From Swiss-Prot:
Top-rank EC class of the record's enzyme: lyase
Binding positions (4-CDP-2-C-methyl-D-erythritol 2-phosphate): 9-11, 37-38, 59-61, 64-68, 135-138, 145
Catalyzed reaction equations: 4-CDP-2-C-methyl-D-erythritol 2-phosphate = 2-C-methyl-D-erythritol 2,4-cyclic diphosphate + CMP
Pfam hit, one: YgbB
Subunit structure: Homotrimer.
Organism whose genome encodes this protein: Leptospira interrogans serogroup Icterohaemorrhagiae serovar copenhageni (strain Fiocruz L1-130)
Protein name stated in the entry: 2-C-methyl-D-erythritol 2,4-cyclodiphosphate synthase
Biological process, per Gene Ontology: isopentenyl diphosphate biosynthetic process, methylerythritol 4-phosphate pathway; terpenoid biosynthetic process
Cystine pairings recorded for this chain: none
Length: 161
């Protein structure tokens, strides 16, 4: 049996030299940072939500509510690990992921290899089962005005026999 999951996450982007910009589990050199209750890693959030969605287990807000002060600035890798544990408990394995980052900045092309390698390590997936790509909104809307960035992620899970 196979299951497909989709995850979407958006965060506000601001100039902040005191907070790192984290995408796909890596720190990116940038004057920008994402605003959020956690470290605001939109890629790991979208993957985590896609896993939960494929398993019909809700969303990351149910497991890691932004109203819980103890979760302030939580590393999104912790969120992902919890979702992977839930996936294993349900006897599913991750087959592949396809992520698209949407926004004007930062440019993803120079970061793509590092992000893909990070995801390969975090997810225990071969590099050829991970797609990370980017697009813009052609300067339209909030993302086009560089007020934020987002990620869409689709995943495929396979039930272990």
């Amino acid at each position: 049996m196979y299951r497909i999951g989709n995850g979407i996450d958006f965060h506000k982007l601001e100039i902040n030299l005191n907070r790192p910009l984290i995408l796909g589990g890596i720190e990116c050199e940038s004057e920008f940072a994402l605003v959020g209750h956690s470290d605001a890693d939109i890629i790991l959030h979208a993957i985590s939500d896609a896993i939960l969605g494929a398993l019909a287990l809700g969303d990351i807000g149910q497991y890691f509510p932004d109203t819980d002060p103890s979760l302030k600035n939580i590393d999104s890798k912790i969120i992902l690990v919890k979702c992977l544990e839930l996936m294993k408990e349900k006897n599913f394995d991750l087959v592949n992921i396809d992520c698209t980052v949407i926004g004007e900045r930062p440019k993803i092309a120079p970061l793509k290899d590092r992000i893909t390698k990070s995801l390969s390590n975090l997810l225990n997936l071969p590099l050829d089962c991970i797609s990370v790509k980017a697009t813009t909104t052609e300067k339209m809307g909030a993302l086009g005005r560089q007020e934020g960035i987002g990620t869409f992620c689709s995943i495929l899970l396979e039930k272990r026999s």
